Protein backbone atom coordinates (compact mmCIF):
# COMPACT_ATOMS: atom_id res chain seq x y z
CA UNK A 1 0.00 0.00 0.00
CA UNK A 2 1.14 3.51 -0.75
CA UNK A 3 0.07 6.91 0.44
CA UNK A 4 -2.71 9.28 -0.54
CA UNK A 5 -2.22 13.03 -0.81
CA UNK A 6 -5.41 14.91 -0.01
CA UNK A 7 -6.30 18.58 -0.19
CA UNK A 8 -8.77 19.65 2.47
CA UNK A 9 -10.64 22.97 2.25
CA UNK A 10 -11.16 24.35 5.74
CA UNK A 11 -13.77 27.06 6.19
CA UNK A 12 -13.54 29.20 9.33
CA UNK A 13 -16.71 30.10 11.22
CA UNK A 14 -16.28 33.81 10.48
CA UNK A 15 -13.80 36.37 9.12
CA UNK A 16 -12.89 37.20 12.73
CA UNK A 17 -11.26 33.79 13.33
CA UNK A 18 -7.49 34.23 13.81
CA UNK A 19 -6.01 32.53 10.72
CA UNK A 20 -2.57 32.01 12.24
CA UNK A 21 -4.06 30.33 15.32
CA UNK A 22 -6.26 28.22 13.05
CA UNK A 23 -3.24 27.16 10.98
CA UNK A 24 -1.41 26.17 14.17
CA UNK A 25 -4.42 24.14 15.33
CA UNK A 26 -4.63 22.39 11.95
CA UNK A 27 -0.92 21.53 12.08
CA UNK A 28 -1.37 20.16 15.60
CA UNK A 29 -4.37 18.02 14.60
CA UNK A 30 -3.06 16.35 11.43
CA UNK A 31 0.30 15.85 9.64
CA UNK A 32 0.13 18.83 7.25
CA UNK A 33 2.65 19.23 4.41
CA UNK A 34 1.45 22.69 3.33
CA UNK A 35 -1.30 25.22 4.05
CA UNK A 36 -2.44 27.89 1.58
CA UNK A 37 -4.98 30.67 2.03
CA UNK A 38 -7.85 31.08 -0.44
CA UNK A 39 -9.87 34.33 -0.30
CA UNK A 40 -13.59 33.60 -0.49
CA UNK A 41 -15.19 37.03 -0.14
CA UNK A 42 -16.39 39.55 2.43
CA UNK A 43 -13.16 39.07 4.39
CA UNK A 44 -13.59 35.31 4.70
CA UNK A 45 -10.45 33.31 3.88
CA UNK A 46 -10.49 29.51 3.59
CA UNK A 47 -7.44 27.36 4.24
CA UNK A 48 -6.38 24.57 1.91
CA UNK A 49 -4.26 21.98 3.68
CA UNK A 50 -2.22 19.30 1.91
CA UNK A 51 -2.04 16.11 3.96
CA UNK A 52 -0.42 12.76 3.11
CA UNK A 53 -2.02 9.72 4.76
CA UNK A 54 -1.65 5.95 4.32
CA UNK A 55 -3.77 4.43 1.55
CA UNK A 56 -6.19 2.59 3.81
CA UNK A 57 -9.94 2.64 4.19
CA UNK A 58 -11.15 5.56 6.26
CA UNK A 59 -7.84 7.46 6.55
CA UNK A 60 -9.02 10.55 4.62
CA UNK A 61 -12.28 10.57 6.58
CA UNK A 62 -10.31 10.52 9.85
CA UNK A 63 -8.40 13.63 8.73
CA UNK A 64 -11.63 15.38 7.77
CA UNK A 65 -13.25 14.49 11.12
CA UNK A 66 -10.20 15.67 13.10
CA UNK A 67 -10.24 19.02 11.32
CA UNK A 68 -13.97 19.52 11.87
CA UNK A 69 -13.42 19.22 15.63
CA UNK A 70 -11.12 22.26 15.73
CA UNK A 71 -12.60 25.32 17.42
CA UNK A 72 -13.33 28.02 14.84
CA UNK A 73 -13.81 25.59 11.94
CA UNK A 74 -17.23 25.71 10.26
CA UNK A 75 -16.45 22.88 7.82
CA UNK A 76 -13.65 20.76 6.42
CA UNK A 77 -14.11 19.10 3.04
CA UNK A 78 -11.80 16.94 0.96
CA UNK A 79 -11.61 18.65 -2.43
CA UNK A 80 -8.88 16.57 -4.07
CA UNK A 81 -7.07 13.28 -3.55
CA UNK A 82 -4.40 11.36 -5.43
CA UNK A 83 -2.10 8.41 -4.89
CA UNK A 84 1.56 9.23 -4.25
From Swiss-Prot:
SUPFAM superfamilies (UniProt xref): eEF-1beta-like (SSF54984)
Record-linked InterPro entries: eEF-1beta-like_sf (IPR036219), EF1B_bsu/dsu_GNE (IPR014038), Transl_elong_EF1B/ribsomal_bS6 (IPR014717), Transl_elong_EF1B_B_arc (IPR004542)
Gene Ontology MF terms: translation elongation factor activity
Taxonomic superkingdom: Archaea
Span of the signal peptide: none
Alphabetic keyword roster: Elongation factor, Protein biosynthesis
Family annotation (PANTHER family): ELONGATION FACTOR 1-BETA
NCBIfam families listed in its UniProt record: aEF-1_beta (TIGR00489), PRK00435.1 (NF001670)
Sequence similarity: Belongs to the EF-1-beta/EF-1-delta family.
Function as written in the Swiss-Prot or TrEMBL entry: Promotes the exchange of GDP for GTP in EF-1-alpha/GDP, thus allowing the regeneration of EF-1-alpha/GTP that could then be used to form the ternary complex EF-1-alpha/GTP/AAtRNA.
Annotated protein name in UniProt: Elongation factor 1-beta
Biological classification of the source: Archaea, Methanobacteriati, Methanobacteriota, Stenosarchaea group, Methanomicrobia
Name of the gene encoding the protein in the UniProt record: ef1b
